[in-house]
UniProtKB/Swiss-Prot annotation:
Keyword Protein transport found: no
Keyword line: Ribonucleoprotein, Ribosomal protein
Disordered: annotated segments: 1-51
GO molecular function, one term: structural constituent of ribosome
Alphabetized PROSITE patterns for the sequence: RIBOSOMAL_L35
Compositional bias annotation for Basic residues: 10-24, 33-44
GO biological process: translation
HAMAP family: Ribosomal_bL35 (MF_00514)
Organism of this sequence: Pelobacter propionicus (strain DSM 2379 / NBRC 103807 / OttBd1)
Family: Belongs to the bacterial ribosomal protein bL35 family.
Pfam family, one: Ribosomal_L35p
Gene Ontology cellular component list: cytosolic large ribosomal subunit
Protein name, per record: Large ribosomal subunit protein bL35
């Protein structure tokens, strides 16, 4: 049986944590930041976890990460 291809777009956007859950970056951080509050921008730093509903689908896209 052939190897499963990794979806390259997903590989750049998601990482797996040590426990196997999928981490993601936050949206709304690349441009048009002047009208966003300091608090809002601060809370968008770092990573978040992908919702439980989407975990299975994204894990299939990045099988070897």
């Amino acid at each position: 049986m052939p190897k499963i291809k990794t979806n390259r777009g997903a590989a750049k956007r998601f990482r797996k944590s040590a426990s196997g859950r999928v981490k993601r970056g936050n949206a709304f951080t690349s441009h048009i930041l002047t009208h966003k509050t300091r608090k809002n921008k601060r809370n968008l730093r770092g990573t978040s976890m992908v919702s439980d509903v989407d975990q299975k689908n994204i894990s299939r896209l990045i099988p070897y990460k």
